[in-house]
Structure formats: structure tokens, C-alpha cells
Amino acid sequence: MSSDSSVFTGENLNDYLKAVAKEYKKMGGKAMPAELILIGGAAVIANYGFREMTTDIDAIIHAASVMKDAINLVGDQYHLQNGWLNTDFMRTASYSPKLDQYSTYYRTFGGILSVRTVQAEYLIAMKLRSGRLYKNDRSDIAGILAEHEKRGEPITMDRITQAVTNLYGGWEQISASSQLFIQQIMQNGEYQKTYGVIRQEEQDNKELLISFEGKYPGATTSENVERIITDFKKKQKRNQTLNWL
């Protein structure tokens, strides 16, 4: 099986899910219909066109135990990385047991695998809860807002507040930086223009962290990563100022 080379797109996602349904049925899963709830990048590429790919598929899985074997077999067949379809996010802060309730039907594969997704304000709420400055969280929020505006179905701040409340109990569970971000982007309203700027910033932050990790291996944690990015940028800015003097 290959490592770290898998790319999932809106085009091939359905092919892989269809293959999983086929293998699950062959393994005897037809006695227990299965359900997947796609979240994160997989939910973005399933519902929207602004993002081309994701490198893994995060999901909530309701199925017989053979589902794990079916997923691994499809991974072997298509040379996908280990954990290409996983439930790891359920151990993160963005998980909520209420995601099942607020997910939306997507498609059924093989007459046995029902797939649902999280979208619109609920996906935005999850991205705000996660709030990673070096991933696609903020650019995904901008992209979702932009697409809904194009569709003539704009997402309001009231809807986002309701989603945050339904999933996490209220804004107190969302970081101050994420709250400031959503307030500013909603007030600005230029979602499409902002998307490219934010995405570039995320890529810069990722490169910054790679550089930091090279100098200080193992020093980065989920608790200090935002402070590291902020401090590193301040240091870079000071150095640039000194070079200009």
C-alpha cells in the first residue's frame, strides 16, 4: 500500500465509496445496512466545488465490524494509504455526538451503504471549533460562504450561531481567534476575494511550522501551535524591519 500519496476528489470519492459498499456486501454486511457521515475535507469536496481535493476521508461509521475489513481491502485494491477512511476526528474537539442529527443525506451506494454529509453552517461550526491556522479550516469557511452566496442561499450569522449552539452548546466553546475571524469575514462579505488570501496564509503557516519543527523537533503541540505561528510571524516581521533600516 502506498503512503501519503492518496488524493481524493469530487470525481473519485464516489468510486471509492461504491467499492466499499460492494466489498461490505460481499463480506456479509447486507444483514446490517451501513451508514457513513462524511465530515471535514470529504464533506467539502462532496458538497462544494471550490476545493479540489483532500488527503483522507474523515467519517462517522455506523456498520457491522466487517466494514473495517471492507475499507482496508478497498485501500489495498486502489493503493491508498493506511487510514484513508477513518474515524480519528472523533477524538478531536470538533466532534459532537449531535453530528448525526444535523447531517444531510448524500447518496446510497450498492443499496446498502447510506452516506450523509455535514454541510453549510454546520460544517462552518466544525471548522470554527477546529480553528487550525495551518490547514484548510478558515479557507473552507470562506469557500462555503462564497458558494452559498452564489447559489442565492446566503448563510447568515444567526444560522452559524444556531449551528454552534446545536453542536457545541454555544460560542464559549469556540476560540477567541475563531470568533474574531468569523465576525470579520461576515462583516467584510467579500468571501470569494478573501478565500484566496486566506488559503495562501494557511499554506505559509504550514511551511512556517515545517521550518519550526526542523529546528525544534517535537516542540509543536495542538495547545501551542497557534502561539508558535503568531510568535514566528512577529519575529519574521521584526527581521524584515531591521533589514530595511
Predicted regions and their residues:
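Compositionally biased terminal segments of proteins
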Residues: M1-L245
